[in-house]
Regions:
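N-terminal hydrophobic membrane-entry segments
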Residues: 1-263
């Protein structure tokens, strides 16, 4: 009975995968960092419920919009990446299409795939996924120093060199600069969306930890405490330097803006 059930599932699954599909991701909200691409039926524009969920049919169209980066994952490994807006055709023999390259060849390939699926309970032996990454600036991230942060005030003209304690509150922005690093080290395979709140606390904690050395860098530039609000760009650059090892080299994130609402 198990073989009969597997055979029935395999036939339905393989034939469902033969319809050419397209993958498209509409504009993502600012709180969405990663979204799994959904398979749409090429004929009706509806989600294809007949094919295997994690199979990309040969000849399928993949659309990449502005502010997005797309990666294709096959068996857990990244096999393609595209950050250029446009429509692309998926061209590989991993899952041959009945409607591409002649009915006979496609049917024969489907049959070979059908035989392989018996050992997987009617599910394709391949696991292919498309992920879309939001590469726009993620803005409006709030921060605030719970405890005062030391700030060194140096003025060589008058021989001043003292430490004061300051608090600051505001918002910052960041951007996914390397989606491959973000996928490998942060999000991995996700079923639907990977949202900002899942990493927000970690980023805020690291940002607040980096504030002290960043303040140290701008104080060395001779910037006074009262003028810090006029040098937020310099502070953002200093924060990027401090956070480059964790955010840049590990997370694939670049710090883009730092705003101070009160100091």
């Amino acid at each position: 009975m198990g073989l009969i059930t597997a055979a029935g599932a395999s036939i339905s699954s393989v034939l469902g995968d033969q319809w050419k599909e397209y993958f498209y991701c509409s504009e993502m909200d600012t709180n969405v960092l990663v979204r799994k691409g959904q398979k749409n039926n090429g004929k009706s524009g509806l989600l294809n419920r007949g094919g295997s969920e994690n199979v990309i049919t040969n000849g399928s169209t993949i659309v990449v919009n502005e502010g997005q980066c797309m990666i294709i994952v096959d068996q857990g490994a990244i096999v393609d990446v595209c950050a250029e807006p446009g429509a692309y055709t998926y061209d590989t023999s991993t899952e041959p299409s009945v409607f591409t390259g002649g009915l006979g060849a496609g049917l024969a390939a489907s049959f070979e795939q059908f035989k392989a699926r018996f050992t997987y309970g009617g599910v394709t032996a391949h696991d292919q996924r498309i992920y879309y990454f939001n590469t726009k600036d993620i803005i409006g991230n709030k921060y605030g120093t719970a405890n005062p942060v030391p700030f060194r005030v140096v003025d060589k003209n008058i021989g001043l060199d003292v430490d004061i304690a300051i608090r600051c509150f505001g918002e910052y922005a960041y951007r996914l600069s390397d989606p491959i690093l973000f996928y490998k080290n942060i999000c991995g395979n996700v079923n639907t969306d990977y949202t900002q709140d899942r990493i927000e606390n970690q980023l805020r904690t690291e940002l607040l930890t980096a504030l002290q050395p960043a303040f140290g860098k701008i104080s060395e530039m001779g910037i006074r405490y009262s003028s810090v609000v006029n040098h937020t760009t310099d502070l953002a650059i200093a924060l990027n330097e401090v956070l480059s090892d964790s955010w840049g080299a590990k997370y694939g994130i670049v710090f883009t803006a730092f705003g101070i609402s009160s100091l």
